[in-house]
Amino acid sequence: VRGYADAGAAGVMIEDQKWPKKCGHTKGKDVVDLDEAKSRIKAAVDARNYGDNDILIMARTDAIATRGLDDAINRMKIFSEIGADILFIEAVKSKDDMKRIIKEVPGHHMINLIEDGDTPLLEINELEQIGYKIAVMPLTLMSASVKIMQECLKNMKNRVYNTNVSKFSELRDIVGFNEYYEIEDKYK
């Protein structure tokens, strides 16, 4: 944590999953016992508090999947008491569970939204009303990219030109070709 803070990172996420790490919305994951989880968070908080670091500590638990909501809430209460700045229970199953988490565990909460995942996709304003301060959608762009790639490959297989793609001129602008050209012209 001190290394990340020294490098300028704004925050780190410390989680309680057993190794090997798995996606929170997939099967086969488990969490370490509470004592080890507490030690992980405590070590991160102590590292943050050493010197002049202001890095944020996000505590994550995947306990809801294998030990239930009560255990996940208990862990978050403890992580908050230890000094975690942001609280993240992964793969929350319902809106009612979200409300319960916010009600029972004071602090700044994050929610992870994955299309077709375990957590319901609520509107951002609804998540704000429930009490979430951060919402992430970590797979949205990758999922959209895969879908359009599949469509393009299907079209190529069927010998059809793809029309649902960026124009080459737009792509050049996005990746910075025009800047490269300007630099090239400047130093000819």
Residue ranges of each PLM-predicted region?
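Alpha/beta enzyme core
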Residues: V1-L139, S143-K154, I183-K188
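Flexible C-terminal active-site loop/helix
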Residues: N158-K188
